[in-house]
Each structure stands twice: as C-alpha cells, then as structure tokens.
Amino acid sequence: MKIALFIAAFIGVASLLAQDAALPAPPDTVGVPYYLDSAASQLKKLPTEPYKKHDPVPGVITVTQTVNIKGSASAFRVPAENKIVFVYDATTMPRLYKFTVNGSNRKFSYGKVSVRGSTPIEGLPISVSRYKDTAYQISADQPLAPGEYAIVLADRIFTFGVDGK
C-alpha cells in the first residue's frame, strides 16, 4: 500500500514538473502582457495602441470615464478557447475590459465621476496565479466571447481580439 501511494505521488509530481517544463520561459519585458499560445508553446507579445481618455469634469450628475481607440479591431487575434491565458511580469494588477465597437472605433468605460468623487469600473473578473519565477498569468473567470478586448497595465492599454470557433 505504501509503495502504491509513493508511486502515485511520484507520478503526480513528475507530471506537474513536465507540464511546467513544457511552458515557455517567462517574458523578459516588465509591464507587457503576452498571450500564451499553448499549442505552439510560445509567448506572443500583445500590441499597445494609442488611445484617448475621456475624463469629464465632475458636476452635479455622474459621468462615465471612457477610453477610445481608433479602428474597429485589434491586429492581434486569438482563437476562442475555454481558457485564454496571458503572462506578464509586473507589480501592477492588470484589468481586463471588453470594448464596445461603434463603426471604426472601440470604447470601454473605466470609471464614474461625480461631485462626490470617482468610482472605478473594475472590468471583467480575472484570476491571477504564478506562472514561472517572477511572472504571473491571468485569465478571465469565464470564457471570452468573440469580440475586442483590452488589458490595462498601469497607464498602458494592450489590445487583442477573440475570433469565433
């Protein structure tokens, strides 16, 4: 019985180590998310795009803060999967937003401002876990539907699109 437990534990540890060895090395760039292409065992750098913030002056009413990016779609495309994973090395917690596409522009809301102050809009729920060494991986808590998305790290916005199956 003890031998069977030892063998089962050894196989479990060996399979975990083998999975970790199959993963690509962590990124060498801080503050930039990478798409984990598990089929190719590669990390692919997400592009950043110029954006325009709309920060209205607080008044009597509550106003929404938005980010606008020109172009109806990101050039970086990923296939729809149950779990889309991104890897990053940064001290800032990333946020994930889904764009609303209107013609040749993409937009998402990130906060609400009123005379009483501002309230952030958190974006889509994500899970963060250790990747390798000092890197982390993030994934949405729910599968991402086809569409346009942004990962916000500090004051930089990285874009990607999810294509249908």
Predicted regions: what they are:
Residues 110-133:
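Extended, solvent-exposed segments with strong compositional bias
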Residues 92-95, 126, 147:
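Short beta-strand/loop motifs in extracellular/secreted proteins, especially
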Residues 19-110, 155-165:
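Primarily secretory-pathway and cell-envelope proteins
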Residues 134, 140, 144-148:
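A glycine-anchored, Pro-Gly-centered beta-turn/N-cap motif
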Residues 130-131, 147-148, 152-163:
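C-terminal partner/receptor-binding element of secreted or periplasmic proteins
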Residues 127, 137-139, 159-161:
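Generic structural detector for well-ordered beta-strands
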Residues 14-18:
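Sec/Tat signal peptide C-region and signal peptidase I cleavage site
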Residues 3-13:
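Sec-dependent N-terminal signal peptides
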